[in-house]
C-alpha cells in the first residue's frame, strides 16, 4: 500500500464544490486508515484559493483530520505524483448554465438539473473543451 495519497483539486476556488469536497474529506472516518492524504488546491484566482485553503485548514483544526492541505496557482506544479485529479472548472459557469436550461426548454425539452444529460449538457461540454483539454494534457505528462 502506498504511504501517501495525493489528490489535486483544480478549480478549488469554487466555494460551492470545494467546500462540499473539503467537508467530505475531513469528515470521512475511513480516510485516516489509508495513510497520509495530501490535497493540493489549485486555482488561478489567488484570493479565492487563499480563502479555500484557510477554510480547509480551519476544518482540519476543528475536526482533527490528518489530511494535509496546500495550495498553488500553478497546476503543473501540483500534478506530479497525483493519484487523483478532480476538475471543478467551467467557462461562464452561472451565466451560461441558465442558458443550458432555457434553450432546450424553448424547443420543448425540459433539461434535468446538472451538466450531465440532454442538450444542455452538450452545450456545457462543447464550450468547456478549450479549457479542459490543456489541463488533461498536463495530467498526461
PLM feature segments, named:
Residues 2-101, 111-141:
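Metallocofactor- and cofactor-centric catalytic cores in central/energy metabolism, strongly enriched
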Amino acid at each position: 500500500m502506498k504511504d501517501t495519497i495525493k489528490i489535486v483539486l483544480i478549480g478549488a476556488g469554487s466555494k460551492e464544490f470545494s467546500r462540499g469536497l473539503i467537508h467530505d474529506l475531513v469528515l470521512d472516518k475511513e480516510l485516516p486508515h489509508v495513510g497520509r492524504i495530501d490535497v493540493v488546491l489549485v486555482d488561478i484566482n489567488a484570493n479565492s484559493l487563499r480563502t479555500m485553503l484557510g477554510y480547509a485548514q480551519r476544518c482540519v483544526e476543528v475536526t482533527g483530520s490528518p489530511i494535509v492541505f496546500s495550495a498553488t496557482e500553478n497546476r503543473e506544479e501540483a500534478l506530479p505524483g497525483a493519484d487523483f485529479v478532480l476538475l471543478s472548472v467551467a467557462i461562464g459557469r452561472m451565466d451560461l448554465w441558465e442558458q443550458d436550461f432555457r434553450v432546450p426548454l424553448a424547443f420543448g425539452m425540459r433539461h434535468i438539473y446538472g451538466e450531465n444529460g440532454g442538450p444542455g449538457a452538450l452545450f456545457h461540454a462543447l464550450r468547456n473543451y478549450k479549457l479542459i483539454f490543456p489541463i488533461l494534457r498536463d495530467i498526461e505528462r
